Amino acid sequence: MALLQISEPGQSPDPHQRRIAVGIDLGTTHSLVAAVRSGVAECLPDDEGRVILPSAVRYLEGGRRAIGFDALAAQAEDPENTIVSAKRFMGRTLTDIDDREKLPYRFVDQPGMVSVATRDGVKTPVEVSAELLATLRFRAEDSFDDELFGAVITVPAYFDDAQRQATKDAAQLAGLNVLRLINEPTAAAIAYGLENGSEGLYAVYDLGGGTFDISLLRLSEGVFEVVATGGDSALGGDDYDHALADWALAGAGLAAETAQDKRAVLVAARAVKEALSSAAEARMQVVLRAGLLDLAVTRVQFEALTKPLTDRTLAAVRKVLRDAKVSKDEVKGVVLVGGSTRMPQIREAVTLYLGRSPLTDLNPDEVVALGAAIQAHQLAGNASGNDLLLLDVTPLSLGLETMGGLVERIIPRNSSIPTARAQDFTTFKDGQTAMAIHVLQGEREQVEYCRSLARFELRGIPPMVAGAARIRVSFQVDADGLLSVTAREQTSGVEAAVTVKPSYGLADEQIARMLQEGFTTAEGDMRDRALREARVETERMVLATRAALAADGDLLADGERAGIEALMRAAEQQALGEDAAAIDAAVKALADGTESFAAERMNRGIRQALAGRRVEEV
């Protein structure tokens, strides 16, 4: 199948000049780096032949670091200084981390992002991630014996702007040139699309160590389009470990009293979870300060106690299908991504719900890195004639505030990115020289129920009558999901802009709540919107009529003026009520009642414009 070729700005025009570009899966539990070598994407191993790098960093005395397997080996004995799953903290504040009491770290709530106190000082998730990225960068450079041109780094589909920017910052600290951030499910689709050449509608079910993503993708004629996305940025294999650990401690009547105990129980729980993927029973043994934890765990027990977690993933699948307005029968195949999908209960639940066995052709641990490597190979200009078009989507609608506290959507939810859209707005009052721009994210019709992203002002608008100025507001979302908003007054050219980089992340429960409320309150929201719009139109009409009376009231007889003023009062009184139709009727009555007055004003304006001018000048 011939795929559409896309050339990126700055791409080398020389087809023989090969640049070393890699794909990096910066995962919660482990990370990988892959590259295309001799036309085949492959994960790059370390000196001992291991392709997986545990996402763990241990901080030692004197500024030394232990990274990956070395850090993981000391996790139980030195949990406070061994940071794992740092990806879960990217772009987050302390209040965003619901399970912090279960974690052994000494959290520090610094402005902008939570940090962890270690023996080597306070470390941010960005710094921890940078250590992992630098290790993978050195591995790739050693493998090719050359410097890297750049990297495509994957992120969960539900990472918001703050989390994506934090990932870019970590890459910069690691000395990496980021060619693009792409969603993990999309990277998996790239790998499977190229390997199998299959077209159709696919569900990508990605359950990693700390995040869950479900995406619906349409593969057709070389185009990967993400139709809809969903998920939970704080649900993954780690939560299965915590559930098993809590259950085991409660059953034994013991408590994890120290950080070492907490970490040791979690390590043992993970080992049991992995063993139960191939065995019907496994033994959990941990020496704690309070005593010996020793019990047998069956697969049936484990699946029963973690069923609520599995059900949460299926609820997200249902939501994505509803968003895309497709039935389960239309899904051609299911792609499993993430090591946690090796659990038999996951494969059984997905098969039962979607009615088809998932694709498992590629290693679920490696598939994301392989797809990222293929994309990096193309963006570096190394691929010849077989590039593909990649379309990600915005997870929530983007818009701005208008009069009456209403939200005007500019970019709807699930719009393919990169994208740019613009809309014209105007002034509300005569002589208005500034306009406040309030950028919002969410699915509700009212400002108070949406998330505020940014505020800025456009100043220097030429004074005009209300409605005469034309302000074009442009929204642009780049390939990394970052938003830029520009407001420009068309006649004067004055302009203001903002790039949205929120200082904190959007918690997973907030995302779920915003989407659910947008769905369940849609009918009521539309009624409220109609009422607010009617009130805004009343205010606009009354203001315009008052201004007209002040300027040209001498055109009216006393009785005519009194009639118009009575209609104005009636409209204002009606606007205090809750009946949008009645308000609209009052505004229409005011418009009808001022129609002859408007005609007289127009005639006066024409006479004034033509006064003293000859026919040939007109």
Curated annotation (Swiss-Prot):
InterPro entries documented for this protein: ATPase_NBD, Heat_shock_70_CS, HSP70_C_sf, HSP70_peptide-bd_sf, Hsp_70_fam, ISC_FeS_clus_asmbl_HscA
PROSITE patterns, A to Z: HSP70_1, HSP70_2, HSP70_3
Taxonomic superkingdom: Bacteria
SUPFAM superfamilies (alphabetical): Actin-like ATPase domain, Heat shock protein 70kD (HSP70), C-terminal subdomain, Heat shock protein 70kD (HSP70), peptide-binding domain
Pfam families: HSP70
Disulfide bonds: none
GO biological process, one term: iron-sulfur cluster assembly
Gene Ontology molecular functions: ATP binding; ATP hydrolysis activity; ATP-dependent protein folding chaperone; unfolded protein binding
Protein keywords: ATP-binding, Chaperone, Nucleotide-binding
Keyword Chaperone set for record: yes
Biological function: Chaperone involved in the maturation of iron-sulfur cluster-containing proteins. Has a low intrinsic ATPase activity which is markedly stimulated by HscB.
Family: Belongs to the heat shock protein 70 family.
Official protein name in the record: Chaperone protein HscA homolog
